[in-house]
């Protein structure tokens, strides 16, 4: 079993670019059809480590879905981000839904 470093709803930062993001899903290993060289950075070990679906914001504040290796991410220690409140709200909403899922008929 592969253990992931980050959880769904957790805020993370891209190590190189510094962008804030929220984890929305986790794959135990790279799961796209055919990996591009820049996505796995010529390191085959990355392919067999956890990969994360992360929502980040572009320069205009629009949500962007990214697919990143665990090695590309750091945990985010800061709770509030006044410059990106929508990502704080998304993280809180996801965590709330995981704690109290809605029952469906």
From Swiss-Prot:
Its main location: cytoplasm. GO terms for biological process: response to heat. One of its GO terms (cellular component) is cytoplasm. Keywords: Cytoplasm, Stress response. Residues 75-105 are annotated as: Disordered. One of its GO terms (molecular function) is DNA binding. Pfam families: YccV-like. It is found in: Cytoplasm. Belongs to the HspQ family. Involved in the degradation of certain denaturated proteins, including DnaA, during heat shock stress. HAMAP family: HspQ. This is Heat shock protein HspQ. It comes from Serratia proteamaculans (strain 568).
